[in-house]
Amino acid sequence: MIHVSTLMGVDPRIFTGNEQKLMNVLISTAPFVNRMAAAGLPTIFIETFIHYYEQLVSGQTGYIAEDDIRPVTQIPDVETFPQHLAEIGQRSLSKTAVIKLNGGLGTSMGLEQAKSLLPVKEGYSFLDIIAHQAQLTNVPLLLMNSFSTEEDSLALLDRYPNLNKDLPHSFLQHKEPKIRQDNWQPVEWPENPELEWCPPGHGDIYTALVTSGTLEGLLQKGYEYAFVSNA
């Protein structure tokens, strides 16, 4: 297989039909592929990024029309559930891990750290409260952090030594190149190259669980369920 970097400078007119379409795609995505590969990002993540990049440049928005959304009209009352369901739930706790999506910064609230570190009550942050809840239920707590939230969030969890005796406290989501809106090319910021990258969003959890080894680690230790929510 020819690496896409070798295709730069090749005249697409030598190809026809589907070949030319493929060639155009390879040329337009090559700057992203090369940048991500140089950063050591795994192939499965690069392929996922390119999949959605191709949708972007083809005009797809990813939006769901409001007319296609139907509101929930009735929610079951947990107090009405039969007792055997509660017993099943209690037994399942020993096979359940809590994963909190913790990649976002609180810049809009004046915080240059993870939003979960914002103090909310009596000096406790959201993450403090989450850690207390995890300790009370005796379930492992894992954070999906971004490269911007990892260090500060783990420093806070050091206050809770009883968390996760046999599992890591976090795994990292990937990073992806920012895209210019005017020409769909990677953003260039030589003065601060870190500003050329951004987190890919919550949907990266599926890829990050695999590439970080977290999914394999959870399965090896007998966990079957994950409760996933924002931090």
What do the PLM-derived regions correspond to, one by one?
Residues 74-97, 108-231:
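Domain-scale recognition of functional cores that engage charged ligands
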Residues 2-90:
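Low-complexity, highly charged intrinsically disordered N-terminal segments
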Residues 102-108:
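Conserved phosphate/anionic-ligand binding catalytic regions in large, soluble enzymes, centered on
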Residues 1-2, 165:
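Polar low-complexity intrinsically disordered regions
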